[in-house]
From Swiss-Prot:
It is found in: Plastid, Chloroplast thylakoid membrane. This is Plastocyanin. Belongs to the plastocyanin family. Keywords: Antiviral defense, Chloroplast, Copper, Electron transport, Membrane, Metal-binding, Plastid, Thylakoid, Transport. GO terms for cellular component: chloroplast thylakoid lumen; chloroplast thylakoid membrane. Pfam families: Copper-bind (PF00127).
Length: 98
């Protein structure tokens, strides 16, 4: 699995790393690293055609350090992801599924 931290070790509001590549069906573990409330929203305008962004998003907040959400993406292409409360601070990432 690929691990993506929600929040940098330095307390930054960021996905770390901000770009990953995965094989179709490979697990992606989103882990709250900082204890700030974060969520994982797939941008409906930035996912491959036919993908239901709402179905793969995790809208609830991960509030505690160590809380984890796992997603597996099966449709190849590029996915845009953001954290709803911190999108204005630039908390966004890109996932490329091979």
């Amino acid at each position: 699995a690929q691990i993506v931290k929600l929040g940098g070790d330095d307390g930054s509001l960021a996905f770390v790393p901000s770009k990953i590549s995965v094989a179709a069906g490979e697990a992606i573990e989103f882990v709250n690293n900082a204890g700030f409330p974060h969520n994982i929203v797939f941008d409906e305008d930035a996912v491959p055609a036919g993908v239901d962004a709402d179905a793969i998003s995790y809208d609830d907040y991960l509030n505690s350090k160590g809380e984890t959400v796992v997603r597996k993406l099966s449709t190849p292409g590029v996915y845009g992801v953001y954290c709803e409360p911190h999108a204005g601070a630039g908390m966004k990432m890109t996932i490329t599924v091979q």
